[in-house]
């Protein structure tokens, strides 16, 4: 890798891969860079809000299923707009899917990381760079308020449920007056 490609690789590793590896316990908190420790705070908050709303379960037994389901959900999430809040939801969703694979001992967490990395590189990175890159993402993570987090979590859940056709998930969202 050279020049611009290396810069992009480093951005994705700082924002996405580091958090996923931390989330699935492949690295400890003290192994995170100072930047990663800062964004971990907002991502952990997104994760906590998401966990309060619904339990996301997966049925993944092959690399192809992971790629298909993952790409379907995140394509739906970003089909009409990219913003930092949705990117946070994307990262947390990626981490949850990787953790599921690791906990299921199916050794497919690397497929999730690779699929998420490629999606971010090809679909999100140009937007991220044109909107301030790592610095703006950090600013967003430091200054997000509870309402923007909840709004983005509700939006993510509605897209997740729409794509995955989880009737029980949709019903839960309705019962909680979230959609």
UniProtKB/Swiss-Prot annotation:
GO cellular component, one term: host cell endoplasmic reticulum
Motif position, BH2: 126-141
Pfam families per the UniProt record, alphabetical: Bcl-2 (PF00452)
Keywords of the record: Early protein, Host endoplasmic reticulum, Host mitochondrion, Host-virus interaction, Inhibition of host apoptosis by viral BCL2-like protein, Late protein, Modulation of host cell apoptosis by virus
Gene3D superfamilies: Blc2-like
BH1, short sequence motif: residues: 76-95
The UniProt record lists the keyword Disulfide bond: no
Induction remark: Expressed in the early phase of the viral replicative cycle. Expressed in the late phase of the viral replicative cycle.
Subcellular location(s) per record: Host mitochondrion; Host endoplasmic reticulum
SMART domains (alphabetical): BCL
GO molecular function, one term: BH domain binding
GO BP field: regulation of apoptotic process; symbiont-mediated suppression of host apoptosis
Subunit structure: Interacts with host BECN1 (via BH3 homology domain); this interaction allows the virus to inhibit BECN1, and thus autophagy. Interacts with host BID. Interacts with host BAX.
Function recorded in the entry: Suppresses apoptosis in host cell to promote the viral replication. Has the ability to potentially bind to all the members of the proapoptotic Bcl-2 family. Inhibits autophagy by interacting with host Beclin 1 (BECN1).
UniProt family annotation: Belongs to the Bcl-2 family.
Record protein name field: Apoptosis regulator Bcl-2 homolog
Organism of origin: African swine fever virus (isolate Tick/South Africa/Pretoriuskop Pr4/1996) (ASFV)
């Amino acid at each position: 890798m050279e020049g611009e490609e290396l810069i992009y690789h480093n951005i994705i590793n700082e924002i996405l891969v580091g958090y996923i590896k931390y989330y699935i316990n492949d690295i400890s908190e003290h192994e995170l860079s100072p930047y990663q420790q800062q964004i971990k705070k907002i991502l952990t908050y997104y994760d906590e809000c998401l966990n309060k709303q619904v339990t996301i379960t997966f049925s993944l037994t092959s690399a192809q299923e992971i790629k298909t389901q993952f790409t379907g959900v995140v394509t739906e999430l970003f089909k009409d707009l990219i913003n930092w809040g949705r990117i946070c939801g994307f990262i947390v969703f990626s981490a949850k899917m990787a953790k599921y694979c690791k906990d299921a001992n199916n050794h497919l967490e690397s497929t999730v990381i690779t699929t998420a990395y490629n999606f971010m590189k090809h679909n999100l990175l140009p937007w991220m760079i044109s909107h301030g890159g790592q610095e703006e993402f950090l600013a967003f993570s430091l200054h997000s308020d509870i309402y923007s987090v909840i709004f983005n979590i509700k939006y993510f859940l509605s897209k997740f449920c729409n794509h995955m056709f989880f009737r029980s998930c949709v019903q839960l969202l309705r019962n909680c007056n979230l959609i």
